[in-house]
Amino acid sequence: TREKPFTCTECGKGFSDKSNLRSHQRTHTREKPFTCTECGKSFSQKIGLHNHLKCHTGEKPFMCTECGKSFSNKSNLHTHRKIHTGERPYICTECGKTFPRKKNLQSHQTVHTQEKPFTCSECGKCFSQKKNLHTHQKIHTGEKPFKCNECGQAFLRKRNLLSHERIH
């Protein structure tokens, strides 16, 4: 193992070189010096910005050998592969439900805490999960993304489309 003479004064973690220590320290300061010129989103690491830029170029060099779906970064491909393996290592201690990603578990846990951190800017209604806020906001925009191939009727929610399709 390499010598780690550079130590973080905040948490005690050691690093082999000063640039890695500086990069790590931004996790404590929340400093994000790398900014996307396209959309303004900022990152604490240069690699974060580099990976993000691919969403603007559409570049997706990491392909799943199982199904052919492509991803802009290796981390997203790795997470995606859990769909095929069935791996769901993150477990909710409250109800036992399992998740393939840590952030899915964290999002789910707001259901148990009654925390509703996502607020609609249009009407003030609050939601425990971001995806539910996004679905709700379509009420205000009138967007109905799920369309019946049979008759053309459109729906706000996929479950409503599936229910509707049973009548054809």
Swiss-Prot record:
The keyword Transcription regulation applies. A zinc finger (C2H2-type) spans 6-28, 34-56, 62-84, 90-112, 118-140, 146-168. Keywords: DNA-binding, Metal-binding, Nucleus, Repeat, Transcription, Transcription regulation, Zinc, Zinc-finger. The keyword Disulfide bond does not apply. It is found in: Nucleus. InterPro entries: Zinc_finger (IPR050331), Znf_C2H2_sf (IPR036236), Znf_C2H2_type (IPR013087). Gene3D superfamilies: Classic Zinc Finger (3.30.160.60). One of its GO terms (molecular function) is DNA binding. One of its GO terms (biological process) is regulation of gene expression. Transmembrane segments: none annotated. Belongs to the krueppel C2H2-type zinc-finger protein family. May be involved in transcriptional regulation. This is Gastrula zinc finger protein XlCGF7.1.
